[in-house]
């Protein structure tokens, strides 16, 4: 049976990648269908109830700068906000928020249902309609054919999902949801480089059975930060604390005694899990010299007693889970509401994707999220946004959006994935970016919002707000340059705790390491200073890091001369005999789109790149 209504874009999956993909496509004016196995789980936080963190917060800011929904949603559902690395440089400072997962999901659902050009449909997708090498649509569980020009697959952990608790395992996309086995089989019939990964989650606890008086209180920041550039702290719901406790020697002994039933250590699970989010049993074995590991006790929301003990992800048997949980300070009488588990699932080699996240071998099919080997809500959402934008661009015959490594963390992530691939769940960190001083949280809108305007992703009101903000920044910088402090100014010397030996502008004073905008504002200048903390930080960072940023821009310009040189997919690398056999094989396998991508393939040396450039010049001449 074929449905008569035709959509231009179909998005499969309603998680963090799927929702951003569908909203982006629809915002660009393209008729879009989001199809999910269960509409009640749209925007579900399957694991930890939090958004942001080091590197991840940067992605959320970039998604927001491009008109995405994640930042706005967490501003309306976040029950604790903190700035991480606050004492470090601005490049690595990051926002993190604890979420009320019920509120979060509700806000996502509201955004989806009220977006023009977007329809929702509840069904599992069992098959793809592919003719030749071109996607034509999808087939649902009930045999309904839905036709589309582009399809974006955001399957999360559902493809061939198997859940493990001790020696028991069963099929599932996550606890309580069926897997997508039929779709997994369909994709496996194509040569797309399928492999398996695993992730895990801790047991959820009944907060009424915990003794918080035995734990350390962890409060949020004051003043409260916001994620969205147009967000206001008044949008935040009631704020509540988190808590910290620790495992102990007895906890670790109980875990060791239960390893005989661990699917990880008995070989039932062979897939690789997240390096930076290991299970508690993995931590106990790998760091056997330690008698304690930190646990963040995180509330799941304002209207539930459920608690998420961050740091004890596990797939041990239920009995061992309960025993080791009850050995932890404050958890002595804890009751488990949901057991922890590990889940294995299919992912596909992201080196088989174009920079747009379109599958190289199947035109019009895009992959986003965990299907590409990433882990985390933020990484998934960023890929969904990119895939949604580029699917719409292809429909509208616009140039694709291809963010570069020096423009965004989204660009860093996609470039890493499509050039290097991954054999473990990929997580974003600031350390992955070469130019992280340019890729700060505070300037994500400056970097990306003009592109969002060009693509039709933001409203005119949002664009006006952006222009007002940066006009104010430029006006204030101009004022600081034209406001002078005289030599030996007594008030300035006292406030700055240093002698001003000759005349300085406020602009020059702000370059000093121990002088920030708020200190400067105490000096009598005869004119008002800004009171908006966001604008203060932007101005501070632009002035303080101007010299370093200038040097990085010079480096980038040199690099870009060859970075964007296009490599035709028709090049026969085996014919370039000056290249080593290894390099020829790798270039043939990956078919990089640019010299920059080729240079980041493992084993491709700078000498090989020089040979390629000579080859291209010879070919042109």
From Swiss-Prot:
One Pfam match: GIDA_C_1st
Residues reported to bind NAD(+): 273-287
Residue stretches in coiled coil: none
Compartments, as annotated in UniProt: Cytoplasm
SUPFAM superfamilies: FAD/NAD(P)-binding domain
A GO CC annotation given for this chain: cytosol
Gene Ontology MF, one: flavin adenine dinucleotide binding
Entry-linked InterPro entries: FAD/NAD-bd_sf, GIDA_C_N, MnmG, MnmG-rel, MnmG-rel_CS, MnmG_C, MnmG_C_subdom, MnmG_C_subdom_sf
GO biological process, one term: tRNA methylation
Cofactors required: FAD
Residues that coordinate or bind FAD: 13-18, 125, 180, 370
Keywords, alphabetical: Cytoplasm, FAD, Flavoprotein, NAD, tRNA processing
Gene3D superfamilies: FAD/NAD(P)-binding domain, GidA associated domain, C-terminal subdomain, tRNA uridine 5-carboxymethylaminomethyl modification enzyme MnmG/GidA
NCBIfam families assigned to the protein according to its UniProt record, in alphabetical order: mnmG_gidA
Function statement: NAD-binding protein involved in the addition of a carboxymethylaminomethyl (cmnm) group at the wobble position (U34) of certain tRNAs, forming tRNA-cmnm(5)s(2)U34.
Family: Belongs to the MnmG family.
UniProt subunit comment: Homodimer. Heterotetramer of two MnmE and two MnmG subunits.
Protein name: tRNA uridine 5-carboxymethylaminomethyl modification enzyme MnmG
Species of provenance: Vesicomyosocius okutanii subsp. Calyptogena okutanii (strain HA)
